[in-house]
């Protein structure tokens, strides 16, 4: 079960983010940004909101592909000012608590956003690590570009 989680739950799990733990819950839940959690079953979220989470993904909506956190913030705010949601879903951090859950949440959220017509492109803002590169390439993404501090991958549906 995938659900968009609120700031209260985000506050309790930020410490587990291995990529961007410095981004607070206000950043993650404002300016057309959302945080999704993958739960063990459909009832876990109702009874144990911050327990039984298998994976987490943070998404920002932009109209341009960001090269770093500063551009991510700027582009999502600009998309928000237009009174519309950006058409690019940027997955800027993902982590999992169980094997295979990272892949599951990326693929499920991308499909859900695509089916709901909430985004037309699905890209990442990933760290320049071998682990991030292997994860995304192994899960069907293509490398778009490498920058000074980050790299972008794109998932197509």
Where are these regions (language model features)?
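Conserved beta-strand-loop-alpha-helix junction that forms the acyl-donor binding cleft
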Residues: 96, 123-134, 147-157
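Alpha-helix-centered segments that form part of catalytic cores
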Residues: 84-100
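Conserved GNAT acetyl-CoA-binding A-motif
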Residues: 89, 115-128
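Glycine-rich phosphate/pyrophosphate-binding loop shared by adenosine-nucleotide-utilizing enzymes
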Residues: 46-57, 89
